[in-house]
Amino acid sequence: MDPRIVKLADLLVDYSCRVQTGDKVLIDYEGDCCKDLVRQLIKKIYAKGGLPYVDIRDSAVTRELLLSCSEEQITFMNECSLQKMKGMQAYIAIRAGGNTAELSDVPSDKLNMYYRLTSPTLDYRVNETKWVVLRYPNNSMAQLANTSLEAFEDFYFDVCTLDYSKMDRAMDALAALMERTDKVHIKGPGTDLTFSIKD
């Protein structure tokens, strides 16, 4: 197992979701290239005393469903998803689909209906669970970055496996300054920007 994947799994479970004994964790992933990370997450969650569950997504299958879906169908899909989500304490999503434009030809009324009717599950997940969503490096992402997959993976793992708890502590002074600040003025060559950060 690539040690960078082990480190990323540790970060997602320990820092991002703070998985505890007994936590039910839904791992929701798309793309074959992230299976090693999914497997490592399962191992790590078990080691923490948690219970991993896995959903597998496929944008091509989702596209086919959405092209002819009905409101009744999506409403029921949301009821099932929401019931499952209400049983979870944490959610880890990994997105590594091969085609970022797979849903581009789904009619906007179908997509809007889907997003509107499934929003209760999203709202519950965001407000009631410990969660993290990340993209995972693949050929599609490397191509969008105009780089090789290997170079993109190196960049990705360097950025995604930083010591975020250390960064969090390092930002305490800035956060304290921002709490007592109203107006911010940024001035430089070609820039003169003033704005409020109050509330």
Each model region followed by its residue ranges:
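Active-site bordering "gate/hinge" segments
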Residues: 1-199
